[in-house]
Regions:
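N-terminal Rossmann-like dinucleotide-binding module
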Residues: 1-30, 151
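Short, well-ordered coil/turn segments that N-cap beta-strands
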Residues: 10, 46, 69, 94-97
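Conserved acidic residues
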Residues: 13, 46, 120
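Beta-loop-alpha module in the N-terminal Rossmann-like domain of NAD(P)-dependent dehydrogenases
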Residues: 30-88
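Short loop/edge segments at beta-strand edges and connector loops
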Residues: 36, 73, 100-102, 163-166
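Conserved SAM/SAH-binding loop
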Residues: 37-39, 126, 167
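A contiguous active-site-proximal alpha/beta segment in oxidoreductase catalytic domains
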Residues: 78-134
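Rossmann-like dinucleotide-binding domain that binds NAD(P)(H)
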Residues: 131-175
Length: 175
């Protein structure tokens, strides 16, 4: 919100958040309008950022695309490949932009190392504490997607082989 509010490229009209406490804080901190109704919000915008738990990405993005709004979705795009394909088809049908936020591409450490990187072999390990919200989607969609995106942007050839292992330890998805 801070960056959008400061940008000359966007007119930030407001936000919608179901968490009343957080919404009040955002409203006061940034002096922007809080919308309580998704239809009212949709009627006043031409693009939307969806920064919600992954499980709600599909329904929200579908709603806004059907309202002919451009959509930026925090990664991962959806919980399933089928839902992602449906959103892509909808965006194409209406000539809209649908963008997934792969923010690691803009990490200064990555952009600096990319200039000197010439990989022959790439291996990625993701280690971190186990967050409660980590149970809503698999680690592949939540974190490994960053590694895959970075690797795809670094290599200048087709991928020959991918090996991956995952197991359920705490949640219903590979953790």
């Amino acid at each position: 919100i801070k960056l959008l509010n400061a940008s000359k490229n966007f007119d930030l009209l407001g936000f919608l958040d179901n968490d009343d406490k957080r919404a009040i804080e955002i409203q006061q901190q940034y002096n922007i309008k809080r919308f309580d109704d998704i239809n009212e919000l949709s009627n006043q915008i031409n693009a939307v950022i969806i920064a919600t738990p992954t499980k709600s990405h599909y329904s929200l993005a579908k709603f806004f695309l059907q309202q002919k709004k451009h959509v930026f979705i925090e990664k991962p795009i959806t919980s399933t490949i089928q839902e992602a394909k449906e959103l892509t088809l909808l965006a194409n049908k209406f000539g809209l932009i649908g963008q997934v936020g792969h923010v690691e591409r803009f990490n200064s450490a990555y952009s600096n190392v990319k200039k000197i990187l010439n990989p022959m072999f790439i291996e990625a390990h993701r280690l971190s504490h186990y967050p409660e919200r980590g149970t809503d989607v698999s680690v592949v969609l939540d974190l490994m997607i960053h590694d895959i995106d970075i690797i795809l942007s670094v290599i200048d050839s087709p991928i020959k082989k991918v090996n991956a292992n995952g197991t359920k330890v705490i949640s219903d998805n590979p953790d």
